[in-house]
């Protein structure tokens, strides 16, 4: 692996040389994962400093809390404090983008199914970074239920899957008043299709199946409308946590568990992304920085960046990985990712005339939601005598 040599600096003070040694050590450790000795660092681009001088800097940096020594004769490894100094040093630098844009294909996407696009984009980012990815999105309006599917869980419960025109998927667990056969489930799904499309009439339904179908249809419509109207949290997409298993840093199950607890906490994920969107710039949290977002002290790092619709921040995307991350490369990749999805989402929002909105605390229906309830596709059927 090629070691990035530091730029020679003339007439620098002791503090500047100490900082240069620290950044060089962190850079080398990120690339190799091995403790760094004075001779090793000297050969990695610090030929202008003697090994004794480097050891003196190591001792000073260790005393200041930036380095740890694994054992008396071993090299040093960076602490979370050192990672923060390193990440901050390169946060706003203009690192070159990859020669081949891994997100170039995003620009050819043309569809109103923006939710599907954002999920696929998150998957691609996870693949490129080997990190877990979480992404927030506004609510895209003028969306309608396109399909309803049923999956029996047991004799008394059924999982109802709601799919919309924009690719959003919601699930609801419903109680079954009667036991249904697989054929009965299919007939009820056909009933849903007929009601949603207003094409034809449902056929071959048994009386008890029709009762269940009508009840489920009415209940699912109301649940969807209430959830659609009472938009108090951004939509959150998460993927790629299994990729963290490939990091040697997470071979310790306790470290992995603390990171998993953070990743599975949707509220914490939303808070991190909300802060990034509000600040409107690339942001990072390392180690104890995340303590306020978790019950324990996660031994991991989170990097976030906002994305835009017509230059207005509407959401953010985050990476979760170990503290030993290639921050310089990931900062550059995140900026490129944000640029690409911002361009693609903006283009499709305008092309398909899609409105969007941010979460609100109000529980009252707006005029648009009142009109939505009146749409013919959402008419609730009541066949009671």
From Swiss-Prot:
Molecular-function GO term, any one: DNA binding
Biological process (GO), any one: negative regulation of DNA-templated transcription
InterPro entries: GAF-like_dom_sf, HrcA, HrcA_C, WH-like_DNA-bd_sf, WH_DNA-bd_sf
Record's keyword terms, sorted: Repressor, Stress response, Transcription, Transcription regulation
DNA repair is among the record's keywords: no
Keyword Transcription: yes
Function: Negative regulator of class I heat shock genes (grpE-dnaK-dnaJ and groELS operons). Prevents heat-shock induction of these operons.
Family stated for the protein in its record: Belongs to the HrcA family.
Protein name: Heat-inducible transcription repressor HrcA
Organism, as annotated: Protochlamydia amoebophila (strain UWE25)
UniProt lineage: Bacteria, Pseudomonadati, Chlamydiota, Chlamydiia, Parachlamydiales
Protein's gene: hrcA
């Amino acid at each position: 692996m090629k070691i990035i040599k530091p730029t020679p600096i003339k007439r620098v003070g002791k503090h500047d040389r100490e900082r240069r040694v620290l950044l060089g050590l962190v850079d080398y450790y990120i690339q190799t994962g091995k403790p760094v000795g004075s001779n090793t660092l000297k050969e990695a681009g610090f030929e202008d400093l003697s090994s004794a001088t480097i050891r003196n800097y190591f001792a000073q940096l260790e005393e200041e809390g930036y380095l740890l020594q694994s054992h008396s004769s071993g090299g040093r490894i960076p602490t979370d404090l050192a990672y923060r100094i390193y990440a901050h040093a390169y946060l706003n630098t203009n690192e070159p983008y990859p020669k081949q844009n891994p997100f170039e294909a995003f620009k050819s996407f043309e569809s109103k199914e923006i939710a599907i696009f954002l999920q696929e984009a998150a998957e691609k980012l996870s693949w490129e970074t080997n990190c877990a990815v979480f992404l927030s999105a506004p609510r895209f309006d003028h969306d309608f239920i396109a399909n309803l599917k049923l999956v029996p869980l047991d004799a008394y419960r059924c999982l109802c899957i709601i799919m919309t025109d924009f690719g959003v998927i919601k699930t609801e667990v419903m109680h079954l008043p009667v036991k249904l056969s697989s054929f009965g489930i299919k007939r009820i799904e056909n009933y849903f299709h007929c009601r949603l499309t207003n094409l034809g009439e449902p056929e071959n339904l048994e009386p008890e199946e029709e009762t269940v179908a009508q009840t489920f249809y009415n209940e699912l419509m109301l649940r969807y409308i209430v959830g659609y109207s009472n938009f108090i949290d951004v939509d959150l997409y998460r993927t790629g946590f299994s990729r963290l298993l490939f990091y040697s840093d997470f071979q310790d199950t306790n470290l992995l568990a603390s990171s998993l607890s953070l990743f599975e906490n949707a509220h914490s994920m939303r808070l991190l992304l909300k802060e990034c969107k509000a600040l409107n710039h690339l942001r990072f949290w390392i180690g104890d920085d995340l303590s306020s977002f978790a019950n324990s002290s996660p031994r991991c790092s989170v990097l976030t960046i906002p994305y835009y619709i017509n230059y207005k921040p509407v959401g953010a995307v985050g990476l979760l990985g170990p503290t030993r991350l290639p921050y310089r490369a990931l900062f550059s990749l995140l900026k490129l990712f944000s640029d690409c999805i911002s361009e693609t989402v903006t283009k499709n929002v305008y092309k398909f005339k899609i409105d969007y909105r941010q979460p609100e605390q109000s529980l009252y229906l707006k005029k648009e939601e009142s009109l939505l309830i009146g749409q013919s596709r959402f008419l609730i059927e009541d066949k009671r005598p």
